[in-house]
Amino acid sequence: DTINEWMAGDDLGAIHARVMGWQGDDSWLCKARDGFAHGSPLAASWIFRQLNQTQEATLEAVFESELILGCNIMRHPEFAEGVRALLVDKDRSPAWAYPDLASVPANIVDSFFTAPADMPVLGLPG
């Protein structure tokens, strides 16, 4: 029930406010809230868009979208910064490109959903 309450609607800012305002004591939900609080605002933006745009998609379309998104994520400096902060320096202090959800430009999020010219073809049966 809590997750459904958190995720209601199509406004990521409102969802973020509900999650951050939650005062429960469930350890799993606390970990999810803390991850959202400290994670990349850019990543939260493309994750939210991916979840919304593939809700009614075919499995083939979801896989294709995941491939496009994955190729673009790996090319973006935000991914390397997350790896650096968590696995390399282990300082857990990433310098995200955007400080909050409101500062993430829509055209940057859009760019994650455009296939790179050199992306491999998934070739699933249609």
Where are the regions a protein language model picked out?
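C-terminal alpha-helix plus adjacent terminal tail
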Residues: 1-126
